[in-house]
């Protein structure tokens, strides 16, 4: 098993970057916060072992570009670990997600109807494991994906 030797965090918001910097001070390894979005990651190609994404893929403006950048910076057989919410498989729920998506985008920049699992594989990742389930809460925002994918 490998140890974490360094963490890079991407955050375009200065306010949130400052909050993350405060939290990162107690980490047992160096944390470097980068003023960038996932669509243009300021790191060398094939320089990262693992990318962790938690509740962010719904709000990235250009998801395809972001997943392409994640693939670019990951080393061969690198891992994308994700915990995300997205489009529910139930037609009645997904219709509500589609209806409410403009409101969520306007209020929180969130796209609750993205097909996260399909987007990851369409970007060229190999799905290693994935679980899909409703978590507690309103069904139109509680369908979640947790898993890991590898670069191919």
Predicted regions and their residues:
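Class I SAM-dependent methyltransferase SAM/SAH-binding core
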Residues: 1-40
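A short acidic, Gly/Pro-enriched loop at the edge of an enzyme's catalytic core
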Residues: 39-51
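A short SAM/SAH-binding and catalytic strip from SAM-dependent methyltransferases
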Residues: 49-62
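Short, glycine-/aromatic-enriched active-site segment of Class I SAM-dependent methyltransferases
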Residues: 91-106
């Amino acid at each position: 098993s490998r140890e974490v030797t360094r963490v890079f965090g991407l955050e375009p918001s200065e306010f949130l970057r400052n909050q993350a910097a405060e939290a990162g001070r107690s980490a047992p390894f160096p944390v470097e916060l980068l003023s960038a979005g996932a669509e243009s990651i300021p790191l060398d190609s094939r320089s990262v072992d693992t990318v962790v994404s938690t509740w962010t893929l719904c709000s990235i403006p250009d998801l395809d570009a972001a997943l392409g950048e994640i693939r670019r910076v990951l080393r061969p057989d690198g891992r994308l670990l994700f915990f995300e919410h997205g489009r529910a498989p139930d037609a009645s729920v997904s219709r509500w997600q589609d209806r409410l998506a403009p409101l969520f985008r306007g209020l929180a920049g969130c796209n609750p109807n993205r097909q996260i699992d399909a987007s990851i594989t369409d970007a060229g990742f190999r799905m290693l494991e994935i679980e899909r389930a409703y978590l507690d809460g309103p069904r139109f925002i509680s369908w979640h994906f947790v898993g890991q994918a590898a670069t191919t």
